[in-house]
A protein has these predicted regions:
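Cytochrome P450 I-helix active-site segment
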Residues: 1-3, 107, 111, 164-167, ...
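Cytochrome P450 heme-thiolate monooxygenase catalytic core
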Residues: 62-70, 86-88, 102-254, 273
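Alpha-helix/helix-capping structural signal
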Residues: 47-48, 101, 145, 342
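N-terminal membrane-proximal hinge/A-helix region immediately C-terminal to the signal-anchor transmembrane segment
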Residues: 1-77, 82-85, 89, 111-116, ...
């Protein structure tokens, strides 16, 4: 773009990214350079270029750079602001917490908590048709799952308090005030954010102290698993847990909202197909495990299609530590690379009718298109720095959708798609009001 337009484009990109990303691709293609000097950006949304980017050694990039706004919230030892040997050690410890056995154990808990959420919704509406914003309903469900997953049953009852403390910081990250450079002094709103973060860290520190005194035998408690691993200091454990809380709360809740909106708008035929699948797979009272999840093929395709269209993050940053080559372009050291799941997920070369919600597209992708489509589905990233909790997030979205279809009727109240808002998390403005009733 012309240099005189670039400051305004960058400002819009950091406040309302999706329209700007679409404009840049239409005008200049899926790889675009912006800015100069210390504010040099490269937007990368081409699927083939992303394969090259994700395949570049992680040491060629830095995540603990001055533009990583999340470090303020998650702590200085967090995975998402770590580099080099420290990152590798922390990543290894946290990755071990997402073992196959632990993921398998979380399946039943997700179904049980979804049932409790549905019971509460039915009690609230009397089972009669009512318009309900399922975004906050889903968010409360997700926060219960995430807090129980991270902290075990002891703190599960405090999930609302924990989520509210984190939400203060999340809202601040999305505000224009946070993106001031230099950042404002710790007064007013920023001071309140710090106070809530301090309160959240105190809760986690107290739970760590408790588990040091009384080790947990709960096989599903991720915090207990990190402490038992022994390779991280207590501060590191705390920062990773808060990172996982942030990564698993707002992002999954927003993805669930978009998923429910897409499926509801697709019409009753898709909902009936989801119900038939769930009736077959999730019959009875359980126990349910990963073998049941693997059979929810249609629900999984709906999850994949909704996250393709509406990834939780429209772009993610990494700073080039050395000169790198991506998609035939030289990206100089010091460039902030913004790779975009939004652009890749709507790439017209990878997807037929890319703006349409078509879960069955994954069944009949043309052979010549399949490899490109595989590269273009990156809502959870790819490579060594992908989303570490992607398996849990996909599990939650798939199981929640299947159980809702099994027990409720859901229909849209309008065919107007919600406006996507948010720089850090892509969420639907105004929520997702849907007509909900108990299954006949």
């Amino acid at each position: 773009p012309p240099r005189w337009r670039q400051p305004a484009l960058i400002a819009r990109l950091l406040t309302d990214p999706r329209p700007v990303l679409d404009e840049l691709r239409t005008a200049h293609g899926p790889i675009v350079g912006l800015g100069a000097g210390p504010m040099r950006l490269a937007v990368v949304g081409d699927p083939v270029a992303l394969r090259e980017l994700f395949g570049t050694p992680v040491d060629a990039f830095r995540w603990g750079h001055r533009f990583n706004v999340l470090g303020f919230v998650v702590g200085r030892t967090s995975l998402i602001v770590s580099d080099g040997p420290d990152w590798k050690r922390r990543r290894s410890a946290v990755q071990s917490g997402f073992s196959r056995r632990r993921l398998n154990g979380w399946v039943g808990d997700i179904v049980d908590r979804t049932d409790a959420c549905i019971d509460g919704l039915v009690a609230r509406t009397g089972g009669e048709p009512a318009v309900v914003d399922l975004y906050p309903v889903g968010r409360e469900l997700v926060q219960g799952i995430v807090v129980r997953t991270l902290f075990g049953e002891r703190l599960a009852a405090r999930s609302g308090e924990i989520a509210a403390l984190f939400q203060t910081a999340q809202d601040y990250l999305e505000s224009p005030a946070y993106r001031q450079v230099p950042h404002p002094l710790p007064i007013g709103r920023r001071a309140r954010v710090r106070a809530d973060l301090d309160a959240l860290r105190a809760i986690v520190d107290e739970q760590i102290d408790h588990l040091r005194r009384e080790p947990s035998d709960d096989p599903l408690d991720l915090l207990a698993a990190l402490l038992a691993d022994g390779s991280l200091r207590d501060e590191e454990v705390r920062d990773q847990v808060i990172t996982l809380l942030g990564a698993g709360l707002d992002t999954t809740a927003a993805s669930l909202a978009w998923l429910l909106w897409c499926v509801a708008l697709a019409g009753p035929g898709l909902w009936e197909r989801l119900r038939a699948e769930a009736d077959d797979v999730l019959a009875g009272d359980g126990p349910f495990d990963a073998s049941h999840l693997a059979r929810l093929d249609l629900a999984d395709r709906c999850m994949r299609e909704a996250t393709r269209l509406h990834p939780a993050g429209s772009f993610a940053p990494r700073m080039a530590h050395v000169d790198v080559s991506v998609g035939g372009y030289r990206i100089p050291r010091g460039t902030l690379v913004l790779w975009s799941a939004h652009l890749a997920g709507r790439d017209p070369a990878a997807w037929t009718d890319p703006s349409a919600f078509e879960p069955d597209r994954f069944l009949h992708v043309r052979p010549e298109q399949k490899a490109l489509a595989d590269l273009a589905w990156v809502p959870f990233g790819r490579g060594a720095r992908n989303c570490i909790g992607f398996a849990l997030a996909q599990m939650e979205l798939t199981l929640i959708l299947a159980r809702l279809a099994q027990r409720l009727d859901v229909a849209p109240t309008t065919d107007r798609e919600p406006r996507a808002v948010g720089m850090v998390v892509n969420r639907p403005a105004g929520g997702v009001p849907l007509r909900v009733s108990r299954r006949p």
